[in-house]
Amino acid sequence: MRMKGFIAGICILAVLSATDAAAQKRLTIIHVNDTHSHLEPERAGEEAGLGGVIERAAYRDSVVKADGKRNVLMLHAGDFNQGTSYYSVLNGDLEVELINAMGYDCITLGNHEFDNGVEDLARRLAKIKCPVVCANYDFSNLEAGRYIRPYTIIKKAGMKIGIIGLMPDITILVPREVSSQIPAFNNAEVVNRWASFLKDEKGCDLVIALTHIGFEGEPYTDPMLVGRVRNVDIVVGGHSHTFLSEPAFISDLDGKKVPVVQDGCWGLNVGNMKVMR
């Protein structure tokens, strides 16, 4: 299975004494996106033999063994559904079981999670054991809203980590009978509101935007988002199937360089970001 590693330092002191260095907090973020029901290694083409949920689990185990479970944060940036017969035949239930078995700490939703309708999405979300985050759509009048929150807070590696979720523009990606039931909020406005809340009121050490809006393409991208917000430390993205071999550092409203990562598609790669604070 092809792997890659991201190393990013967030808020590292310019000068560390020996005591400071020993006390430094180290977090590992494992992330995937757009796995699209690809549960087995690819069978043909340039990617033959790559991917597979068993292989992803083995990689997870190796990272947890090396870094310690309490120091590893696992994220999925959406579109875990649709793309193989596992989804079309089993209606997305197997993917939910595997999300739970993999032990993700948090996920966001992609447009393909809605392919069987919002009612069936609610049925599947009821079985997911980790937080599901989405801040830029209002699900409050739907059954699915019981299982979706704008943000979550997770403690790992001695850090308090706030995670905000974003979905893509479903008005152009999802049937109107579905999208018309789910009012949208402005992406930058909701991220600024929740990021400020997480930093200032909840005392989060780190704020992550877990997005499915794409690194490139139309009508909105992660780089565009970063340029319009503050208080976000990392963007873990999906949707455009972009493979970033290293983080793209984008300036936010305050000129801070924010690392943006995305890991291709189909689970061919597993992102590994090291965060030191």
Language-model-detected regions and their locations in the chain:
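Bacterial Sec-dependent N-terminal signal peptides
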Residues: 1-25
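Acidic, metal/ion-coordinating pockets
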Residues: 22-277
